[in-house]
Design a protein with these regions (language model features):
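Glycine-rich active-site loop/strand segments that organize a redox cofactor
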Residues: 1-24
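An anion/pyrophosphate-binding glycine-rich loop and adjacent beta-alpha core
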Residues: 166, 172-284, 336, 345-351
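Conserved redox-cofactor binding core of oxidoreductases
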Residues: 34-130, 135, 142, 186-189
Length: 460
């Protein structure tokens, strides 16, 4: 426990909440046992003991994994389990639009009120575009991150910051959005909306970051070399790329046991082959990509936001665990611990909830104009390019000012479109991306020292 706690605090660069770190580290093992009982299969050695991996900034082997797709394995087993439960209704192909508060009853809701209530959410059925009103005694945001506000990201297409944006519009407190973690090693040249991730565990297995002429460079930046924390590695790669005028560096696995590599990382091995890269003979071209949002909706030790009956867990929440930089693999542990804590707290008060008699219907004014779809697509691309070019690994005061100015114009255009056009998930996601981008920019402007993932050259 103590080593894990210290590693987390060091990675967080003095901005972790120590009590939250203690809770997650100490409660994590019990939560892991629960998901194993639900069917999650972590890799074991021939003796039947769990294989523990090591990743950047960890001082010991402690990471459970399922080959190179641990997240998928956890999702697979939990979805399978939840489909067996008669008391759970799953709404697939639905898009959360907004949280319902007193605002929708005509009251003025401000961020400094302590009696704001969440009554549920407006949700769009994507099969018929009808907006439903869902009443709830407790609402839990578990919507993930916002990597899609960047042009290059490891996040799936749905990671548009919807939960943070909805909570912010509902007047919940949101903080630490300036701390965006960039994964150092996304496969350069990945196709589609999502960059393919070359797991940190590959470096834990012994792969070495090198320049195009096959020279290691990480020792110049940190004595831990290729296993330094993600913020240090990402910044080092960014520096090497800019100083050499290249768009990527390389990850060298050629000296490793390739048969063992294939067993441990079958997806990575096969994907590299699809791109014409044989890891036994070729170095893997990699570049940093937006990966994880260390900030989010402020929540306490029970996952409660600053809005009554609104909870959050996972990447959407700012629990205080990660501080200025997340320790590799702590995210899955945090999600498990806070999902359990949200449930325990909700269970204590759910029977006392009295729902309002009539939630107002979603206002459907506006006309769909097919000509305007091009504006939505254009503005989405512009937001992603703006964030990638100006609000990336290294920032500056001038870039922050320019991005704020341009985002304001995009925001005004999009809000005008929102007022005159029937709602669509594409328009809803664009609004959310703009809200989240604005929070990242504004909180970056307020940050007056370089910490963890945040680096402003004017503060160096």
């Amino acid at each position: 426990f103590e080593k894990h706690r210290k590693d987390t605090l060091i990675a967080g660069d003095g901005m972790c909440e120590e009590e939250i770190v203690k809770i997650v580290v100490e409660e994590g093992p019990d939560r892991l046992r629960e998901i194993v009982d639900m069917g999650v299969r972590f890799d074991k050695d021939p003796n039947g003991d769990y294989q523990l991996g090591v990743e950047g900034a960890h001082s010991a082997k402690r990471i459970l994994h399922h080959q190179d797709m641990t997240g998928y394995e956890i999702q697979r087993s939990l979805v399978k389990k939840i489909r067996t439960l008669d008391n759970v209704n799953i709404l697939e192909h639905h898009f959360a639009v907004d949280l319902i508060t007193q605002h929708h009853f005509g009251e003025k809701v401000t961020r400094d009120r302590n009696d704001t209530q969440c009554y549920g959410a407006y949700v769009m059925n994507l099969e018929n575009n009808q907006v439903l009103k869902l009443s709830a005694g407790a609402t839990v945001l578990a919507s993930g991150g916002a990597g899609q506000v960047y042009d290059l990201t490891t996040n799936p297409p749905v990671a548009t910051g919807d939960g943070v944006a909805m909570a912010y519009r509902a007047k919940a407190e949101v903080s630490h959005m300036q701390f965006i973690q960039f994964h150092p090693t996304a496969l350069y040249g990945s196709k589609g909306d999502r960059a393919f991730l070359i797991s940190e565990a590959v470096r834990g297995f012994g792969a070495i970051l090198k320049t195009g002429d096959a020279k290691p460079f990480m020792k110049k930046y940190d004595e831990r070399g290729s296993l330094a924390s993600r913020d240090i590695v990402a910044r080092a790669i960014d520096t090497e790329m800019k100083s050499r005028g290249t768009e990527h560096v390389y990850l060298d696995c050629r000296h490793l046991d390739i048969d063992e590599f294939r067993k441990k990382f079958p997806t990575i091995y096969d994907t590299c082959l699809e791109y014409g890269i044989d890891v036994a003979e070729d170095m893997i071209p990699v570049a940093p990509a937006a990966h994880y949002m260390c900030g989010g909706v402020n929540s306490d030790e029970w996952g409660r936001s600053t809005i009554n009956r609104l909870y959050c867990c996972g990447e959407v929440a700012k629990t205080g665990l990660h501080g200025a930089n997340r320790l590799a693999s702590n995210s899955l542990l945090e999600a498990l611990v806070f999902a359990d804590r949200c449930f325990r707290d909700i269970k204590k008060s759910i029977d006392d909830y009295e729902a309002p008699r009539d939630l107002p219907d979603w206002k459907t004014e506006g006309t769909t104009d097919p000509k305007e779809w091009v504006l939505i697509n254009h503005n989405r691309k512009e937001v992603k390019q703006l964030m990638n070019n100006y609000i990336g690994i290294v920032r500056s005061n001038e870039r922050l000012k320019r991005s704020e100015k341009r985002l304001k114009v995009i925001h005004e255009e999009t809000e005008q479109l929102y007022k005159t056009t029937t709602l669509s998930p594409q328009l809803g996601e664009l609004r959310n991306m703009i809200n989240v981008s604005w929070l990242i920019i504004r909180q970056s402007m307020e940050q007056q020292e370089n910490r963890g993932t945040f680096y402003n050259i004017d503060l160096a």
